Regions:
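A general structural signal for short secondary-structure junctions and capping/turn motifs
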Residues: 26, 46, 75-77, 126-131
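Short secondary-structure boundary/capping segments
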Residues: 21-24, 69-73, 100-102
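Rossmann-like AdoMet/SAM-dependent catalytic core
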Residues: 80-232
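Conserved Class I SAM-dependent methyltransferase catalytic core
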Residues: 32-87
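Single conserved hydrophobic/aromatic residue that forms the stacking wall/gate
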Residues: 1-11
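Long, charge-rich, low-complexity alpha-helical segments
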Residues: 139, 219-283
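SAM-dependent methyltransferase catalytic-core segment centered on the flexible catalytic loop
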Residues: 10-48
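Flexible loop/turn segments at secondary-structure boundaries
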Residues: 12-18, 62-65, 92-95, 146
């Protein structure tokens, strides 16, 4: 695809973190550490058509000096490419080495296993690796002139399958959200996605719930914490009233500051639309 542009690119790169001396070419990407994944994240966007998506599985290193598990990933993506990473699992160097040595049946002979294990750990130590993240890396062509999206989630629970439509819908929602200011966003009407339920956790004897959250039954099966105000807002999202109208009603009912609530609700609504909890009525 060097000189081509695509609407969809799917990849599962050979991303085991091996040293140059390793003989397992079927799983070795030919780059030290996570360099192959870095090159793909940096360059795949150049091969995507407008609204094009690249989907791949990959591993990445988390170094001791990193501020978060996705610090290095953030630095890889160019400004014209949206990057969404879903971390499904995280392993220490010891856990990672043990996994791949068992995959190669290197644990059958103790002396060789110790040598190979030490080689893995020395290689990780040379780059001050504290963990290895594993999961999905999703890239999307950022519309011209728009700010790119950076989304990083750690979701280790079981996800619904297939996810293709949910991924497409999420990037479409990002494009839709980028076109609207907070004020314009709250002039829209919304409906709650069909797989979303509302949960209330109450301590026996207490009048009010101690926790409230929205839960997705499908796609990525996320949860989203709710305040009293947000729960009130979502409960009225039936596609009839605009977000602005709902907020005005909540302000009157709870005697709140309207400007402050508009700002807080707009931030939450952006996240709820991006994650698929709320759907703009026209979509």
């Amino acid at each position: 695809i060097r000189r081509q542009r695509q609407m969809c690119i799917r990849d599962s790169p050979r991303t085991e973190h091996e040293s140059a001396a390793d003989q397992y070419t079927y799983r070795d990407g030919g780059r030290p550490g996570d360099r192959l994944v870095e090159e793909l994240v940096r360059n795949l966007g150049a091969h995507l058509n407008p609204r094009g998506i690249a989907v791949m599985l990959g591993n990445w290193e988390v170094h001791e000096a990193d501020d978060s598990w996705h610090s290095r990933l953030e630095s890889w993506a160019p400004d014209d490419t949206d990057l969404w990473v879903v971390q499904r699992e995280q392993a220490t160097p010891i856990e990672y080495a043990d996994m791949w040595l068992k995959d190669a049946a290197e644990n059958r002979e103790l002396r060789n296993w110790r040598q190979q294990f030490a080689r893995y750990l020395d290689d990780f130590a040379a780059r001050t690796v504290s963990h290895i993240g594993m999961g999905m890396l999703l890239l999307h062509a950022t519309p011209e002139g728009a700010s790119s999206v950076r989304r990083f989630e750690s979701l280790e629970h079981q996800l619904a399958q297939p996810l293709g439509a949910a991924i497409r819908d999420a990037f479409d929602a990002d494009d839709w959200l980028r076109e609207r200011s907070d004020a314009e966003l709250l002039e829209e009407t919304f409906v709650v996605a069909g797989d979303v339920t509302d949960e209330r956790w109450t301590i026996p004897g207490e009048e009010h719930p101690s926790a409230m959250l929205l839960r997705q039954g499908g796609s990525f099966r996320r949860t989203f914490p709710e305040s009293t105000e947000l729960a009130s807002f979502v409960s009225v999202c039936d596609g009839e009233l605009t977000g602005q109208q709902i907020v005005v009603a909540i302000v009157a009912l709870l005697e709140l500051d309207q400007d402050a609530l508009l700002g807080a609700i707009a931030r939450d609504v952006r996240d709820l639309v991006a994650y698929g909890f709320l759907i703009p009525r026209w979509m």
